[in-house]
């Protein structure tokens, strides 16, 4: 459903309204905060050194590339620091944050991986659409951050880790519940910019 969402179509077409993109990015910046906490928790709780190092590498990428995009996009969209830091969170953003922070506080690597596979896998799905990129930086760069060999390798790493860790678990009920909640929230997140 997300791959054909109105938000994705308009982003690729370059026709998404600035207000819609602005509202989405402001909320996504708060998602980004909790997302970084999940990656940090994975560095702490992954069961193999190689895995810890891969998460550390991704944290460096996010600091340089993704946060850089947010700062440039906010400037272009004329969003002040106060506007994106001191904002009322949308109920979907709040619910997503709570789900992510509950994974962090669980200290459970498998629960963290479920959240990451959903978040990143869904974005790879729509980011990899075989369509021409829009001209504007604020549109094309958000797509570029979620496609290409580096991002695809990252998502495959997450899937492989979840498969590896999940094989040793007897009861997958809680993981399945978390998975279902995360999928529903990811889909609802695309509607944020259109709600106002």
Language model features: what each stretch is:
Residues 133-140, 163-173:
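Acidic interhelical loop/turn segments
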Residues 1-16, 35, 157-168:
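Short alpha-helical hairpin
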Residues 1, 15-45, 65, 114-124, ...:
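Alpha-helical bundle segments that constitute or directly flank the non-heme di-iron/ferroxidase center
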Residues 41, 45, 49, 79, ...:
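Surface-exposed helix-capping loop/turn segments at secondary-structure junctions
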Residues 26, 50-153, 180, 184:
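Active-site-proximal alpha-helical scaffolds that flank and shape metal-associated catalytic sites
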Residues 6, 36-37, 68, 94:
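A generic alpha-helix surface/boundary motif
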């Amino acid at each position: 459903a997300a791959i054909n969402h109105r938000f994705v179509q308009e982003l690729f077409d370059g026709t998404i309204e600035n207000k819609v993109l602005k509202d989405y990015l402001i909320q996504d910046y708060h998602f980004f905060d909790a997302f970084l906490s999940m990656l940090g928790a994975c560095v702490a709780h992954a069961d193999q050194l190689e895995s810890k190092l891969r998460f550390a590498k991704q944290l460096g990428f996010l600091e340089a590339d993704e946060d850089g995009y947010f700062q440039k996009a906010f400037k272009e969209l004329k969003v002040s620091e106060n506007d994106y830091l001191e904002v009322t969170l949308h109920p979907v953003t709040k619910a997503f944050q709570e789900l992510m922070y509950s994974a962090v506080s669980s200290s459970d690597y498998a629960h963290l991986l479920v959240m990451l596979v959903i978040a990143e896998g869904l974005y790879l799905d729509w980011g990899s659409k075989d369509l021409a990129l829009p001209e504007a930086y604020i549109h094309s760069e958000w797509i570029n951050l979620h496609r290409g060999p580096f991002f695809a390798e990252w998502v495959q790493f997450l899937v492989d880790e979840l498969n590896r860790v999940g094989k040793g678990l007897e009861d997958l009920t809680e993981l399945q519940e978390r998975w279902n909640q995360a999928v529903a929230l990811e889909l609802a997140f695309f509607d944020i910019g259109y709600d106002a």
